[in-house]
């Protein structure tokens, strides 16, 4: 960990009412003496002049001094709050850097120092960047929950449960004459199943948190001329796709990025799926399947004039069989303006079924509400936490090790192998909070932060 004293502008670049310069490190008190002529009382606002080396006033403002470890970074911290003109702030930073041992901070270095000094864990540090980058109220609330430790608490509870079970299993191994009795008495199996259930719940919440942060990818798929492009236009609120009566008009992937009550939604319109000898259309269909395989949800567009069915497997079994196993499906029966069907929303075989007219827009608002609910939209903004892809990957890895460990217990009564899988589970979970994390990963995470954070 660096021992340098770092400085950066904490407020956004450009013109503003107030501009803040943040200094952190052992030289913070030296900076105060050089720029202010005195060391402010700890944790008190001090209105004073900010002066250059010739004792000329650069600016006037408020100085705040926090003595480590009682500061954001855990080090001595000085904040200079002056006027928000960029020239003045640049002059002030230049003056601060005249003090020996002070350098410009790297992106995210203040948060990194806070992490290194155990002022926060890695999920909380990431939540700072996510709160700054939030594109919706729900994302901001979820990021704040993570910053306050909601996600961390869930992970710490899991790690503690896994650790306790691992200790129990290893104790059984230490008494080989009784090991089989320990492993088969049901206590270990019960504890393991409770951990798996808890992890499943955290995974579900984390997946929702990732969607809130990154947006949900929704692919509109179906046969040609089912109204996919009309639905894209209706959801986007503009003519993004060409719509004709000719089947196969859309031959490539069309993308629109919209917000529903601030929730980010990535809509993908795809080529109609059918057997064809047309080379260009075949390429479009291949791209359509590539998008489907990475989607969070599929809107299965059905031409309501061609069938009365609502069960997707009855409508097109080959299509359903090819979909990824855990991919969510929403059935959209289109052309209600022609069929005269009531604009209803029903559940059939575990799938939501919407009857709409993409052309006229009838029923589209209900579909939008459905998509918002899938993204985790809550009008009261309560609960939930933000999550990143790396968190999901670590949770998936932990789940995989637990399932392997369960097999070692139930099939082979192999205590040593179960203990090893529990150790690997513990490592995967601890990587989320940063207890066991490579320096390369830390560098990648913090380098994505703003300078001054």
UniProtKB/Swiss-Prot annotation:
One Pfam family assigned to this protein is: MMR_HSR1
Residues engaged in binding (6S)-5-formyl-5,6,7,8-tetrahydrofolate: 22, 79, 119, 453
- PROSITE patterns recorded: G_TRME (PS51709)
Residue positions binding Mg(2+): 229, 250
Q: What is its main location?
A: cytoplasm
> Signal sequence span per UniProt?
none
EC number(s) of the enzyme? Answer: 3.6.-.-
| Lineage: superkingdom | Bacteria
Top EC category: hydrolase
Q: Which UniProt keywords apply?
A: Cytoplasm, GTP-binding, Hydrolase, Magnesium, Metal-binding, Nucleotide-binding, Potassium, tRNA processing
Query: So which cofactors does this thing need?
Result: K(+)
Name its cellular compartments. Cytoplasm
Instruction: List each copy of the TrmE-type G domain by range.
Output: 215-376
Identify one Gene Ontology CC term for this UniProt entry: cytosol
Function description: Exhibits a very high intrinsic GTPase hydrolysis rate. Involved in the addition of a carboxymethylaminomethyl (cmnm) group at the wobble position (U34) of certain tRNAs, forming tRNA-cmnm(5)s(2)U34.
Q: How does it assemble?
A: Homodimer. Heterotetramer of two MnmE and two MnmG subunits.
Similarity field = Belongs to the TRAFAC class TrmE-Era-EngA-EngB-Septin-like GTPase superfamily. TrmE GTPase family.
Q: What is this protein called?
A: tRNA modification GTPase MnmE
**Organism of derivation:** Shewanella woodyi (strain ATCC 51908 / MS32)
